[in-house]
Amino acid sequence: MKAGIHPDYNEVTVTCSCGNTFVTRSTLGKPALHVEVCASCHPFYTGKQKIVDTAGRVEKFRQRYGMK
């Protein structure tokens, strides 16, 4: 391998919005990374579904464009 062409590989602390924190290694130039979803709170891994209210968005779209 050539010397001096590879990025630095440092430890990064990842913090999720649910409060879960873990340490991994990355070429990211920052010591911390904030994410919205991790394996502790993602519906695929937890088996729980999150209800997303899209009915309001649909009604707003229909009113805006005159659809019934």
Swiss-Prot record:
Judging by the UniProt lineage, the source's domain of life is Bacteria
Q: Which residues form the signal peptide?
A: none
Question: Is Zinc found in the keyword set?
Answer: yes
Q: In its keyword annotation, does this UniProt entry include Ribonucleoprotein?
A: yes
> Which GO molecular-function terms appear in the entry?
metal ion binding; rRNA binding; structural constituent of ribosome
Protein residues bound to Zn(2+): 16, 18, 38, 41
Q: One matching Pfam family, short form?
A: Ribosomal_L31
Report the GO terms under cellular component. ribonucleoprotein complex; ribosome
Q: How is the cofactor bound?
A: Binds 1 zinc ion per subunit.
Q: Tell me which cofactor or cofactors this protein depends on.
A: Zn(2+)
Q: Enumerate the UniProt keywords alphabetically.
A: Metal-binding, Ribonucleoprotein, Ribosomal protein, RNA-binding, rRNA-binding, Zinc
Cite a single GO BP annotation.
Answer: translation
> Which family would the database say this protein is a member of?
Belongs to the bacterial ribosomal protein bL31 family. Type A subfamily.
Purpose = Binds the 23S rRNA.
Which HAMAP family does the record cross-reference, listed alphabetically? Ribosomal_bL31_1
Q: Which NCBIfam families match?
A: L31 (TIGR00105), PRK00019.1 (NF000612), PRK00528.1 (NF001809)
**Quaternary structure and partners:** Part of the 50S ribosomal subunit.
- According to UniProt, the name of this protein is Large ribosomal subunit protein bL31
